[in-house]
UniProtKB/Swiss-Prot annotation:
Active site residues of this protein: 96, 169
Binding residue positions for substrate: 12, 14
InterPro entries: Aldolase_TIM, TIM_sf, TrioseP_Isoase_bac/euk, Triosephosphate_isomerase, Triosephosphate_isomerase_AS
The name this protein goes by in its record: Triosephosphate isomerase
Organism, as annotated: Schistosoma mansoni
Main location: cytoplasm
Substrates-to-products reaction catalysed: D-glyceraldehyde 3-phosphate = dihydroxyacetone phosphate
Pfam families for the chain: TIM
Biological process (GO), any one: gluconeogenesis
Pathway: Carbohydrate biosynthesis; gluconeogenesis; Carbohydrate degradation; glycolysis; D-glyceraldehyde 3-phosphate from glycerone phosphate: step 1/1
Length: 253
């Protein structure tokens, strides 16, 4: 990771948690010390967002796991960026592979969500990544560019890019126990950074944080974190365990 980009670790709880379990995790996070060069975020299910934001120290961000592309209306089951901000949260995860593959969200819909979330003042973790069959067909770069291009078409200014973190999450490594090698992760992250150099406003390529998601654990995080273009992690299952605090410290000495 470049020293000019602040290390970023997000914990995506997915559809997990209870008030009792949450209290235990929040206690661990509240007692943990993260240095000034590390930014930490957790994304609980939406029903817990308000309660957790009120009880967790402000240094740790709280994110929603999803939102819709308009501010209000007859969209049963959806929440809007305005609602997320209204309860004190300032981040949202969009484009996660589970939203794409289980719920059928298209590149265009995800891009529209990103555009609206940014317009409403949220910061965004924008997820991209390929499936195993796409990797085996040597389509990793093609898929990532297709997904990223849809998002980039909706973001016009360098100022908006400052509120975006890109999460590269190879779908074949999510919840499978498989993990991209540090070299594989660096290769894709470096490719993405070069793509930004020619497809985004001047300077975005050096400043944007590109984080890795896919079976990150305390055992493999340090080696991954040493890669020049890996600026942090989006953590799934391990974010529900005490080891999450160790992952957050992957670059602390």
């Amino acid at each position: 990771m470049s020293g000019s980009r602040k290390f970023f670790v997000g914990g995506n709880w997915k559809m997990n948690g209870s008030r009792d379990d949450n209290d235990k995790l929040l206690k661990l996070l509240s007692e943990a010390h993260f240095d000034d060069n590390t930014e930490v975020l957790i994304a609980p299910p939406s029903v817990f967002l308000h309660e957790i934001r009120k009880s967790l120290k402000k240094e740790i961000h709280v994110a929603a796991q999803n939102c819709y592309k308009v501010s209000k209306g007859a969209f049963t089951g959806e929440i809007s960026p305005a609602m997320i901000r209204d309860i004190g949260c300032d981040w949202v995860i969009l484009g996660h592979s589970e939203r794409r593959n289980i719920f059928g969200e298209s590149d265009e819909l995800i891009a529209e969500k990103v555009q609206h979330a940014l317009a409403e003042g949220l910061s965004v973790i924008a997820c991209i990544g390929e499936t195993l069959s796409e990797r085996e067909s040597n389509k990793t770069e093609e898929v990532c560019v297709r997904q990223l291009k849809a998002i980039a078409n909706k973001i016009k200014s360098a100022d908006e890019w400052k509120r975006v973190v890109v999460a590269y999450e190879p779908v074949w490594a999510i919840g499978t126990g498989k993990v991209a090698t540090p070299q594989q992760a660096q290769e894709v992250h470096n490719f993405l950074r070069k793509w930004f150099k020619t497809n985004a406003p001047n300077g975005v390529d050096e400043k944007i944080r590109i984080i890795y998601g896919g079976s990150v654990t305390a055992a493999n995080c340090k080696e991954l974190a040493q890669q020049h273009d890996v600026d942090g992690f989006l953590v799934g299952g391990a974010s529900l365990k005490p080891e999450f605090t160790e992952i957050c410290k992957a670059r602390q000495r």
